[in-house]
A protein has these predicted regions:
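Beta-strand-rich domain onsets/edges
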Residues: 190-222, 228-229
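Extracellular Ig-like/FN3 beta-sandwich strand-entry sites
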Residues: 164-168, 213, 281-283
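Short flexible loop/turn segments that cap and initiate beta-strands
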Residues: 130, 136-143, 183-185, 213, ...
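Extended substrate-binding grooves/exosites of carbohydrate-active enzymes
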Residues: 1-150, 157-180
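Beta-strand-rich structural segments
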Residues: 125-129, 172-173, 211-228, 235, ...
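Edge beta-strands of extracellular beta-sandwich domains
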Residues: 178-190, 294-304
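Short, hydrophobic beta-strand segments
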Residues: 158-164, 259-279
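Short aromatic-acidic-glycine turn motif
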Residues: 146-148, 192-197, 238-254, 306-311
Length: 331
């Protein structure tokens, strides 16, 4: 088990100080909120498993947040997940990704927190990666480099304390030969001016009558197009055409708005709309609107249709005692 607690996009400084009892009823995604019975950090969970002589893998409590057991506060749902109830990754997700994935096959780097604070404020910055080295840059200047020893090391992220200045914070991951394998940037942002919608798995082919769901992420950007990572405006969502809206979620443990509504606020810059695919092919128009922001619109194409009458089966797996193919009249 782990029972580490964190809220997506919430950061309580400084990192070296354990912070739990907060008026916002949120847990710090930096990794400095802990419970009395749980692991002291995600790193400790990883190291305990890594350093055993044999391991079949790692079972973690929990992968996803879930409704109920709202420890350590009296809110709506748990804080234990590495992914929130809306399916958005928390920063701790990337620590486990760094430990369990191969940089030669799927290199990545992740820097947190977001980059928008008060000038001169000291900000704890962490970088997770499956690479051998990570480097942090602020507006093109190197802040420093850190070696991550995934096999024997006890510190599995690069860690810096940086005086905030507006601009771009960039993390670069390198392999053992110091060749760049991945990079990620976070940018300072202004006030939100418009909404943006993104379809999860846009290459997916949706089929009518197949009880399928489409997941649409709604976010906000500023006038320069940079994500506003703490946006919290209420968003009204409408769906027309060959599907319907089934619910909205933002992953906020303190939010008690209904999942089945058509209006809900973003939590730290994100809102998820879940759209059900109907019984007939065609197109689905999803619209999102918020006061004072330019609205967004997305079209989902439902290109195929299956029969929903009678009993269906997959011919390739049909079998009978004689071993013969199914008769033509069997559907």
């Amino acid at each position: 088990t782990a029972s580490t607690v964190q809220s997506r996009g919430v950061y309580h400084f400084p990192y070296k100080q354990s912070v739990l009892a907060d008026e916002d009823e949120q847990c710090s995604a930096l990794g400095n909120s802990t419970t009395s019975w749980g692991a002291k950090s995600s790193e400790m969970c990883i190291l305990t498993e890594r350093d055993r002589e044999f391991s079949m893998g790692q079972f973690l409590w929990t992968g996803f947040d879930y409704i109920g057991e709202p420890t350590p506060y009296h809110t709506r749902n748990s804080y234990f997940g590495q992914i929130d109830t809306a399916g958005f990754e928390k920063d701790s997700f990337f620590l486990y990704r760094g430990a369990w994935t191969d940089a030669k096959k799927a290199p990545f780097v992740h820097v947190f927190p977001y980059w928008n604070f008060n000038p001169g404020q000291l900000v704890d910055v962490r970088v997770a990666s499956n690479g051998a080295f990570v480097e942090l840059l602020l507006n093109g200047r190197s802040i420093g480099e850190y070696q991550i020893d995934h096999e024997k090391g006890t510190v599995l992220t690069g860690n810096w304390q940086v005086a905030y200045e507006p601009g771009e914070l960039t993390a670069i991951a390198y392999d053992e030969n110091h060749q760049e394998i991945a990079r990620e940037s976070r940018h300072s942002y202004g006030e939100p001016v418009k909404l943006v919608m993104e379809l999860y798995q846009p290459e997916k082919e949706f089929t009518a009558g197949n009880y399928d769901l489409a997941y649409v992420t709604i976010s906000a950007v500023d006038a320069q197009g940079y994500p506003v990572e703490d946006a919290n405006q209420y968003v009204e969502v409408s769906v027309k055409g060959a599907g319907w809206l089934t619910g909205l979620d933002n992953g906020d443990s303190t939010d008690t708005d209904e999942y089945k509504g058509y209006c809900r606020r973003m939590f730290n810059g994100k809102l998820l709309a879940i759209v059900a695919i109907g019984e007939h092919k065609g197109s689905i128009q999803v619209k999102a609107a918020a006061g004072g922001l330019q609205p967004a619109e997305l079209t989902i194409v439902v290109s195929k249709e299956i029969s929903i009458e009678g009993t269906s089966f997959i011919p390739e797996v049909f079998a009978n005692k004689s071993g013969k193919d199914a008769p033509a009249w069997v559907r």
